[in-house]
Amino acid sequence: YYGQELNTSTYNLARMNMFLHGIAPENQKLRNGDTLDGDWPTGEETDFHMVLMNPPYSAKWSAAAGFLQDERFSDYGVLAPKSKADYAFLLHGLYHLKNNGTMAIVLPHGVLFRGAAEGKIREKLLRSGNIYAVIGLPANLFYNTSIPTCIIVLKKHRDGRDVLFIDASKKFNKGKKQNEMTDEHIDEVMELYSKRETVEKESFLASF
């Protein structure tokens, strides 16, 4: 298991989480570092069967011109804006995905419709068939934000470029401080994901 996190407290929480789930220390390859400014060392494993990301939403980053020559971003001709690093994180994860791998990243809804550089990146991802599914989540689901978020599922190489949209925004139990998705809600979403078809008021399979 490999991972990288800039915030030291979150980094230590990730290590504790792995210990609690029985992952031996020798199988933990976690780094306390900047994912965007300091990419994974090339002397270690650099592509993975599965990539999971929950980056800070709309975080600031340098977006320095030199990143246009960075292999993670160079194919897109533009960079994620300085004020919103969402697509920088997404492209970082996609770059490190194996050709037959799957990636899932949690991001704010804004990544689905914002224009300018983000729109160009999104268009290339769609035309390349990289975006496999978009799952809209309920608002107030996470501790750090009350805004609605989505899970974007990506594939590096696949036949076709259709995209499955799942509306899970109403699949939650309301709590005092946070909303909660139960195992039943998650099972319903996974069934829709597995079927990969249009279901009225639940999911839509879009092709272009």
Regions inferred by a protein language model and the residue ranges of each:
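Conserved SAM-binding motif I beta-strand of class I
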Residues: Y1-E5
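S-adenosyl-L-methionine
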Residues: S9-E45
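A conserved structural/catalytic subdomain of Rossmann-like adenosyl-cofactor enzymes
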Residues: D37-G38, G43-F208
